[in-house]
Amino acid sequence: MALIHCDFYSEVLGTGTAFDAIIPMAPSTNENASIINNSPLPTLFLLHGLQSDYTAWTRYTSIERYAEEKDIAVVMPDAGRSFYTNMHKGYRYFDFFTDELPRIANRLLPISERREDRFIAGLSMGGYGAFKIALSRPDQYRGAASLSGALSFASIEEPDSLLPEWPIIFGPSGAVNNPENDLILLAREFASSNEHPMDLFQCCGTEDFLYNANRDFLKEAQKLGIDIHYEEEPGEHEWGYWDMKVQSVLDWLPTNRIHQPDSDA
């Protein structure tokens, strides 16, 4: 595996930013591995939470080892405390993640540009971001996963007490019932269109303070007929749980969803 660090200037953000990327370098026992066939790599964009940054996944989990076993590239970008949205007063992170970042990553890394090979996941704030980005732009991603995500703001008591920047990010009216930021409304819009079917994975520990928010989102999504692979078990809002569940996310990506090169026949 190669661990690549990239600093670059973002035209959308108007400032410098960074990502880390894990790139398979040697073939595994998977006979269909992209590295064997010299084809562009399937890719997981992996998002961090509110109290961490783009380095957290490599610092607190064994994601590099897990990715090597799956022959998948992992791109871990930085988002500050933005909730992956175009802030009311601040940076346009949603535009950055849906437009600029994929183009830059595709230019610099040996990854596939095909929707069928592109996935997005995240924890906590990043779980919200993964679902927000995927539900808003299902043309870009084949699947999305949320680990302990902040998926239903209506279920979180006094979110501005947890995040003083709340009005700066979402504006004075907040995120609930906002068609650009409320995941329930985005799920309704997604469910009304069958143009880009997408697989969704959701998990949360039963002792997590976001457990009720996760159950509420799952209930609403199921009412809409959205098929979500859901897992729950004892667990809190901490890295031991996320290290375990990111393995579940990678296992959840069936091999027939990973791009295989066309045969010569």
Placement of each model-derived feature along the sequence:
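Non-catalytic cap/lid and distal C-terminal segments of serine-dependent acyl enzymes
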Residues: 1-265
